[in-house]
């Protein structure tokens, strides 16, 4: 791909700055500007949108987002070695790129972006799932983001879109499908990255729902689902007994069989259970309905 921003190819950039991916930070650099541009386009129309990017590394996706017309990109990078590279991109797009040398897990990210907001990221593998759960469980409806376009390990992506009855169905599927409409929109082989990881990767696009598919409180639902799948081979009455002494009665009240296992329960069933558990699990600020 011929760069339209006047900056060198990414392989030249990392060579000039002596950059190499660090396993401790979960880094795998995506250096093909054709691929980073495609991921940016998968996020949809970016004009008049502020974008949060986590883990930009040498800035390939950052360049794609800006080239696609993002109103503003806030790039959160924990690795100080990448800051000089990102500063070069910032100089090409004055006023449109803000780089934060910070840990995304400790950041109040929404304060730095104006609505509408989208999150687009090649997430570091070691924090991707934790960040996703945080983005999926704010107290507000709709969430502070319009969409998420995120790269994960392929097995994580498959867990996000999994359906009841499958071995990959669990917490990520329930929270993702309660808050959004998630779809796998792109796959990438290991050789697309430097260094190549041992697994395939996939991009998942989440379109935020204006209201939950079924009424439930985010914190209560998260607790119930975590307990149920924490011992997924056990019957619900055993897996959830630590939440309430009368758990069998509550399961029946939610329309569930106490002898079912977590992987058999659809999203609607978990939301019904969360509602009947609100008096024993401290809810978040106000019930989400």
From Swiss-Prot:
Q: List the disulfide bonds.
A: none
Q: Which gene encodes it?
A: rsmA
Give the reactions, separated by semicolons, that this protein catalyses: adenosine(1518)/adenosine(1519) in 16S rRNA + 4 S-adenosyl-L-methionine = N(6)-dimethyladenosine(1518)/N(6)-dimethyladenosine(1519) in 16S rRNA + 4 S-adenosyl-L-homocysteine + 4 H(+)
HAMAP family in alphabetical order: 16SrRNA_methyltr_A
What's the protein here called? Ribosomal RNA small subunit methyltransferase A
List the subcellular locations.
Cytoplasm
- Stored SUPFAM superfamilies: S-adenosyl-L-methionine-dependent methyltransferases (SSF53335)
Q: Which family does it belong to?
A: Belongs to the class I-like SAM-binding methyltransferase superfamily. rRNA adenine N(6)-methyltransferase family. RsmA subfamily.
* GO-annotated molecular function: 16S rRNA (adenine(1518)-N(6)/adenine(1519)-N(6))-dimethyltransferase activity; RNA binding
Q: Enumerate the CDD domains for this protein.
A: AdoMet_MTases
Q: Which GO terms describe its cellular component?
A: cytosol
Record function comment: Specifically dimethylates two adjacent adenosines (A1518 and A1519) in the loop of a conserved hairpin near the 3'-end of 16S rRNA in the 30S particle. May play a critical role in biogenesis of 30S subunits.
Keyword terms of this UniProt record: Cytoplasm, Methyltransferase, RNA-binding, rRNA processing, S-adenosyl-L-methionine, Transferase
Q: Which InterPro entries match?
A: KsgA/Erm, rRNA_Ade_diMease-like_C, rRNA_Ade_Mease_Trfase_CS, rRNA_Ade_methylase_Trfase_N, rRNA_adenine_dimethylase, SAM-dependent_MTases_sf
EC code(s) of this entry: 2.1.1.182
Q: Identify the residues that bind S-adenosyl-L-methionine.
A: 28, 30, 55, 77, 103, 122
């Amino acid at each position: 791909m011929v760069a339209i921003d006047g900056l060198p190819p990414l392989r030249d950039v990392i060579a000039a700055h002596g950059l190499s991916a660090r396993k401790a930070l979960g880094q795998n650099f995506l250096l093909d500007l054709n691929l980073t541009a495609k991921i940016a386009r998968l996020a949809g129309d970016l004009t008049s949108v502020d974008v949060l990017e986590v883990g930009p590394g040498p800035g390939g996706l950052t360049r794609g987002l800006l080239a696609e017309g993002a109103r503003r990109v806030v790039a959160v990078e924990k690795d100080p070695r990448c800051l000089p590279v990102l500063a070069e991109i910032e100089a090409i797009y004055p006023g449109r790129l803000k780089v934060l040398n910070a840990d995304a897990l400790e950041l109040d990210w929404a304060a730095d972006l104006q609505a509408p907001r989208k999150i687009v990221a090649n997430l570091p593998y070691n924090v991707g799932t934790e960040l996703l759960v945080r983005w999926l469980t704010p107290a507000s409806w709709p969430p502070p983001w319009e969409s998420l376009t995120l790269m994960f390990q392929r097995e994580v992506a498959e867990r996000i879109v999994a359906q009841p009855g499958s071995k990959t169905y669990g917490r990520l599927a329930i929270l993702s499908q309660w808050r959004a409409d998630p779809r796998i929109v792109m796959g990438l082989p290991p050789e697309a990255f430097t260094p190549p990881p041992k697994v395939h990767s996939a991009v998942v696009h989440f379109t935020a729902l204006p209201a939950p598919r079924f009424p439930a409180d985010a914190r209560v639902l998260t607790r119930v689902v975590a307990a149920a799948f924490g011992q997924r081979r056990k019957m619900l009455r055993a897996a959830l007994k630590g939440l309430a002494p009368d758990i069998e009665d509550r399961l029946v009240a939610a329309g569930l069989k106490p002898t079912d296992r977590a992987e058999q329960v659809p999203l609607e069933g978990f939301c019904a259970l969360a509602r009947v558990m609100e008096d024993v699990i401290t809810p978040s600020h106000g019930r989400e309905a």
